[in-house]
């Protein structure tokens, strides 16, 4: 969806692909491989969001994980936030699960209260929402909460690890998509993804002193 200018410490900028190129990439893969799930993260432009929505409506059989990325963990902007928020409305009803952090959840809904904001997503057509609490002011732990069809299904608390991590949200959403592709329910997929992510974060490596930690995924 985009070429980014970044290193292990921050995002400096990006150039989004055209919607035509995005759809060409998607159709090339679909014509070659037995796709079962789609995960999106940074989309960059409203045109790309609309193109993805068009593609997903053509393929309702695919599981879809929406990670509504607006800002990188390092603080770098990944698009015009106000414009992208309005466009994400088109993708929300198409997703099997949405995985916002609390900053993204508040931006998507315009509400500060997390419970009210989560319910607002369901009013917008969401099926399931995993609220990630890494940006909240809880120095000792991180709390994630899973909601399905408007109901609070489960939550996890894990010790807050020291440092900043590069790609943790992307890794979590991708793992969920992989488990959904294998036939897991949303609840089971999230459980496996959270367990796996905590393990790879504990083994994360720092390429350069002062940089973000990179999850050891393999």
Language-model features: locations:
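Short, small-residue alpha-helix embedded
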Residues: 107, 163-186
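Conserved N-terminal subdomain of the carbohydrate kinase-like
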Residues: 1-75, 218
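Short beta-strands and strand-loop turn motifs
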Residues: 35-37, 65-73, 99-106, 131, ...
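Charged C-terminal helix
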Residues: 187-218
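Conserved phosphate/ATP/ADP-binding segment of small-molecule kinases
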Residues: 81-153, 195
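Short pre-catalytic strand/loop immediately N-terminal to key active-site residues, enriched for Gly-Thr
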Residues: 152-166
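Phosphate-handling active-site elements
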Residues: 152-154, 179-193
């Amino acid at each position: 969806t985009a070429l980014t200018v970044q290193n292990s410490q921050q995002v400096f900028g990006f150039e989004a692909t055209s919607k035509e190129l995005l759809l060409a990439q998607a159709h090339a893969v679909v014509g070659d491989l037995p796709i079962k799930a789609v995960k999106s993260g940074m989309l960059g432009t409203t045109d790309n969001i609309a193109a993805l929505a068009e593609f997903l409506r053509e393929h309702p059989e695919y599981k879809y994980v929406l990670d509504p990325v607006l800002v990188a963990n390092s603080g770098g902007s990944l698009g015009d936030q106000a414009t992208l928020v309005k466009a994400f409305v088109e993708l929300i009803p198409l997703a099997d699960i949405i995985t916002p952090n609390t900053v993204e959840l508040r931006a998507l809904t315009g509400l500060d209260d997390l419970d009210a904001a989560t319910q607002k997503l369901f009013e917008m057509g969401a099926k399931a929402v995993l609220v990630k609490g890494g940006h909240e002011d809880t120095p000792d732990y991180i709390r994630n909460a899973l909601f399905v069809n408007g109901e609070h299904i489960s939550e996890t608390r894990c010790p807050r690890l020291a440092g900043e991590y590069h790609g943790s949200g992307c890794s979590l959403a991708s793992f969920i998509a992989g488990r959904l592709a294998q036939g897991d329910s949303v609840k089971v997929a999230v459980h496996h993804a959270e367990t796996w992510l905590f393990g790879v974060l504990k083994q994360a490596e720092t390429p350069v002193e002062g940089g973000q930690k990179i999850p050891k995924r393999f």
